[in-house]
């Protein structure tokens, strides 16, 4: 369910930062800073270091993203 203008990639959470921000290493080796999407925050989905996540990136700034899914 990615938006048309967003790039969706998978990665692994490497580090937890303050204010529900995370450092995520993508499949291609790039490291981005990502925050939790509103629906995940609303449903109290916990994200820990080492979790596999799906990240939405915008073409305008590829260093920041939004975590939209956590794999089980």
From Swiss-Prot:
GO terms for molecular function: ribosome binding; rRNA binding; translation initiation factor activity. It holds the Pfam family eIF-1a. It is found in: Cytoplasm. Component of the 30S ribosomal translation pre-initiation complex which assembles on the 30S ribosome in the order IF-2 and IF-3, IF-1 and N-formylmethionyl-tRNA(fMet); mRNA recruitment can occur at any time during PIC assembly. This is Translation initiation factor IF-1. InterPro entries: NA-bd_OB-fold (IPR012340), RNA-binding_domain_S1_IF1 (IPR006196), S1_domain (IPR003029), TIF_IF1 (IPR004368). One of the essential components for the initiation of protein synthesis. Stabilizes the binding of IF-2 and IF-3 on the 30S subunit to which N-formylmethionyl-tRNA(fMet) subsequently binds. Helps modulate mRNA selection, yielding the 30S pre-initiation complex (PIC). Upon addition of the 50S ribosomal subunit IF-1, IF-2 and IF-3 are released leaving the mature 70S translation initiation complex. Residues 1-72 form the S1-like domain. Its main location: cytoplasm. Belongs to the IF-1 family. Keywords: Cytoplasm, Initiation factor, Protein biosynthesis, RNA-binding, rRNA-binding. GO terms for cellular component: cytosol.
């Amino acid at each position: 369910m990615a938006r048309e203008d967003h790039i969706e990639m998978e990665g692994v959470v490497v580090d937890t930062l303050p204010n529900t921000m995370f450092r995520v290493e993508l499949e291609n080796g790039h490291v981005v800073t990502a925050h939790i999407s509103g629906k995940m925050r609303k449903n109290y989905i916990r994200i820990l270091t080492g979790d596999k996540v799906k990240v939405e990136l915008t073409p305008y700034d590829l260093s920041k993203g939004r975590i939209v899914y956590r794999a089980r």
